[in-house]
């Protein structure tokens, strides 16, 4: 889809100039007859930057010839304006004027002198949001131009000294992605490391683990459900690569490979009422509603509701999933004050969830192609229940000073009856030892900040000061039951657990993270050179009790982490950047398979250096980056079974990505990630030079869409995914082969009277290949194998009223 929908204009004679101007006005949106005034805050800056910010806030698209604004400055604006009045104020005395060229679209031209003809110069898109809270999509609609960057606010990807990809709700719908794990399958830097039919989702970014706990919700950590995140609630999903603690603070589980932010849905200016009926193999049937409205004077108030119910059997035998979600989003847009609130509740019940397959010292890596049945017992289950809420506020103190803040909370109850799958020999035998595991969580989190725009001579500044606080307490408990034998290739049904053989200790843990960050983005040469310098002070406090007895591994530590980034806009199409980022992570916790189970280790620091380039052709964009991330490595000693630090992990990699619509009706989304992951400084040098576990050398993704000529509304889709081989252990004695997955699909959009209908069908893993997709696990878990998802059919019908 084109970024700007313009009217077709023809050159006119000088005598027809008044008619030409009238035709332009007729192309303007209907609301131009009755101007709607809103409060805008645009700080003094270069004229191009000021116009871009105003277009973003106004929710319109602006196109211009960059040469027109070169070297020009703007005093900005503050107050209530219509779109017309805002442009007029910003352009006053510039010798330029704005002209409407379509619905919600404008261009910039030199103001004509008396008796001169009016000509429109070649243009490039520089800004404009679709609606407040919704980012302008890049060509093709799969990726958004802007993404959330925590402390620094929302920025265009071409003005960001980091690697970031923001996926739109449109790509979520078209991929029929039900969870975050299904959406990230499109990103080569991200991989799922837990079975799709498992108790929870878990990922890696740039080779380092990321948990659902580390996924932010509108900038707040710990709000979203712990084990699985439904995508029907997401307006946009931002994935930023590399440590980002300067931007977002320390994450609950200390992920350093990158961060993910889920942006909630907001009511747009146009009413929306959509119902989606869905089917997923083997017999999962469900429905979803999406309703949005604005009301009040000037449409100040908005409400958006999303609800989902889906239940049935999966493609695995005796496995079923029942998921429910309800999320309500409210917002208020005043002259200076903007408020939003989100309330959500999710429930997910899974019968016979799969676990990662652990491999004993005397067993080889099993043949995944021979695993044709669900090895999880029919009595095993996972029951999760999450209730969450968040309140966000922004207030324009002046035309150059913004105050913002947010608070959030979550209560969760989780109940599992599970068993490990630890293969002990080449025949695939393992022991089923049932474990009842309960976990209750309570989270409270808050953040507040100030953002100041100012000019010192020729240098612009964007100063950011922010403070954050995160509190979480959780209680773990459970029981163990008598063991029984089973087999990976020929599962044996074992009795439903009855009387426990022993009860686990009741462990209560409190985490408190607090921090203050300060950053300044300096703009030189009309903001063509942007330098961001900053640091974040953070304090990490962890306390734990076991059966009421305080543990001896609690800690209270603090650290200042400096970070910085630089971006050079070589041209309007080419940006070069570099960054140095530090990340503080909560200390690892010894897993249940180690003899020092639940021992808490001190926090540690990770460091990244990255350089990159971004090229925007207008309809298609390419990005490239080279990075290096170092952090301490941990492992459970195979002989002593003691968990602890063992050396450092050094990931050096290259990322390439592409997205957009290079040819009308053809859209692409994909990329490549190469990683050279090396272990160093291990105990006695035993593993020095070995490849770090769970890190493929190559990840490749490529997805394409084709609008079939001659059949309006029909689109065919295809996607290929590849990961190369990866090791299971630091010794590099066991590894899995590389794998490929192919997906195919189609959708058909049409109208019945005034009702919009979209039919979607897709097949994931078309070839029904069985393979181990990952050896991934965080350092504080036993490494295990993730089995691929069988061929899965997805069907849906969306009706918009």
Regions found by a protein language model. Give the residues of each.
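Acidic, small-polar-rich N-terminal luminal/periplasmic segments of exported/outer-membrane proteins
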Residues: 61, 76, 121-270, 611
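Outer-membrane beta-barrel translocator/receptor signature
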Residues: 232-235, 245-326, 332-338, 387, ...
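Acidic/polar loop-and-plug regions of large Gram-negative outer-membrane beta-barrel proteins
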Residues: 310-312, 327-396, 409-441, 480, ...
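Structural signature of Gram-negative outer-membrane beta-barrels, strongest in the C-terminal barrel
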Residues: 331, 441, 456, 460-462, ...
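Surface-exposed extracellular loop regions of Gram-negative outer-membrane beta-barrel proteins
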Residues: 349-363, 471-480, 567-610, 621-646, ...
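Membrane-embedded beta-barrel scaffold of Gram-negative outer-membrane proteins
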Residues: 392-396, 402-408, 414-418, 576-577, ...
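Gram-negative outer-membrane beta-barrel transporters
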Residues: 526, 628-630, 645-730, 798-800
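Conserved C-terminal beta-signal and adjacent last beta-strands/turns
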Residues: 578, 609, 693-801
